């Protein structure tokens, strides 16, 4: 027996509602996109290359739909009508909905200091809040050196990996002053709900510093490691690392690397490079306890010395707070964006990176102009 017109209408309305409720990364026009990547510029003298350069809110954008180079954004990070704001606004619109899972974590969490006037240099020089210059302090080493935001309904969700201190605000979109001075990176990925279990495992290894979260009971039952991570539990003992494959909504494969604080080694030299079977060129924050090149390794990591994105004037690694890497071999076109640094002090911190094999993204992120090397 066929459905009545009223029943058909109800099913159609339900379908519309479910489509509307599903979460996705958003592009620069506010449309769904499977994944995108960002390179934010440090404060530089305005050279006309990208809007907001002198104010520290200029950035370049690339996504899987356009498969091009890093494109200068006409909108600044302070604007509400750009990809990052559009993406996070989905959560903000539903922040009071207790059926929605979310977690925001940051080794320099929002609210640890006022975001109205604090600059990153002030964070780095303050013993109480610094996770960079006083790595032996208990408040620094207890949690992973990891930053991100995740939100899911029962259908799909978003994982935004980034390097920005004091970001994001848990109730509304705003880009913090702490993110102005230095370069930063971000990676947004859209996943089906089934991938949340694996993501939760990686958080369990990382032990993130969580400052906002809600985990519905039914989702907690599906995702045991996630529930433990939200509750403040973390991986103890072996194994000290976890490497997983994540499949995005559109079927793209990302490899996520997570280490616990007991890993006690560099993530890139010890885990990422040998797993991907390629040398890496890495850009991270490096101050005071840099890792020497280990040229005896089969696959090793070189460090960036200068970065040149688009037509923006090249800048030194000392002006960059990004956490990114790409393979040295373009025939193995890996790009990684994450949240942990190449510093010996980070050996005892949880953290990780997320990598994809993509020729167009490799070309887009081949922005490291000079590097140290074993020659």
Swiss-Prot record:
Signal peptide: 1-21
Pfam families linked: DNase_II (PF03265)
Documented EC number(s): 3.1.22.1
UniProt cross-references to InterPro entries, sorted A to Z: DNase_II
Keyword match Hydrolase: yes
Class of enzymatic activity (EC top level): hydrolase
Keyword Oxidoreductase tagged: no
Glycosylation sites: 131
Annotated GO CC locations: lysosome; nucleus
A GO molecular-function annotation: deoxyribonuclease II activity
Entry keywords, A to Z: Apoptosis, Glycoprotein, Hydrolase, Signal
Superkingdom field: Eukaryota
CDD domains membership: PLDc_DNaseII_1, PLDc_DNaseII_2
Catalysed reactions, as listed in the record: Endonucleolytic cleavage to nucleoside 3'-phosphates and 3'-phosphooligonucleotide end-products
GO biological process, alphabetically ordered: apoptotic DNA fragmentation; negative regulation of antimicrobial peptide production
Role of this protein: Hydrolyzes DNA under acidic conditions with a preference for double-stranded DNA. Implicated in apoptosis.
Family statement drawn from the similarity comment of this UniProt entry: Belongs to the DNase II family.
Record's protein name: Deoxyribonuclease-2
């Amino acid at each position: 027996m066929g459905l009545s017109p009223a029943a058909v209408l109800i099913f159609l309305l339900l379908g519309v509602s479910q489509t509307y409720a599903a979460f996705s990364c958003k592009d620069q026009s506010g449309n769904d996109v499977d994944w995108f990547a960002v390179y934010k510029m440090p404060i530089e003298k305005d050279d006309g290359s990208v809007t907001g350069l002198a104010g520290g809110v200029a950035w370049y954008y690339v996504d899987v739909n356009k498969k091009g180079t890093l494109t200068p954004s006409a909108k600044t990070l302070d604007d509400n009508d750009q990809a990052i704001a559009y993406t996070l606004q989905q959560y903000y619109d539903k922040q009071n909905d207790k059926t929605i899972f979310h977690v925001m974590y940051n080794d320099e969490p929002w609210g640890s200091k006022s975001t109205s006037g604090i600059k990153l240099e002030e964070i780095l020089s303050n013993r109480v809040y610094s996770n960079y210059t006083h790595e032996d302090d208990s408040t620094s080493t207890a949690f992973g050196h990891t930053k991100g935001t995740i939100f899911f309904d029962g259908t799909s969700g978003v994982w935004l990996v980034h390097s920005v201190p004091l970001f994001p605000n848990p109730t509304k979109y705003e880009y913090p002053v702490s993110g102005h001075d230095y370069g930063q990176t971000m990676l947004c990925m859209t996943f089906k709900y089934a991938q949340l279990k694996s993501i939760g495992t990686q958080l369990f290894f990382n032990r993130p510093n969580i400052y906002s979260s809600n985990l519905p009971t039914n989702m907690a039952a599906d995702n045991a490691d996630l529930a433990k991570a939200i509750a403040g539990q973390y991986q103890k003992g072996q194994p000290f690392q976890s490497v997983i494959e994540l499949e995005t909504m559109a079927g793209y494969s990302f490899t996520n690397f997570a280490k616990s604080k007991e890993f006690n080694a560099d993530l890139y030299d010890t885990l990422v490079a040998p797993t991907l079977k390629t040398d890496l060129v890495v850009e991270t924050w490096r101050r005071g306890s840099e890792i020497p090149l280990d040229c005896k390794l089969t696959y090793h990591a070189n460090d960036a010395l200068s970065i040149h994105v688009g037509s923006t004037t090249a800048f030194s690694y000392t002006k960059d707070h990004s956490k990114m890497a790409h393979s040295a071999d373009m025939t193995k076109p890996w790009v990684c964006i994450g949240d942990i640094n190449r510093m010996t002090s980070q050996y005892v911190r949880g953290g990780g990176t997320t990598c994809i094999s993509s020729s167009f993204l490799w070309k887009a992120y081949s922005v490291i102009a000079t590097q140290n090397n074993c020659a």
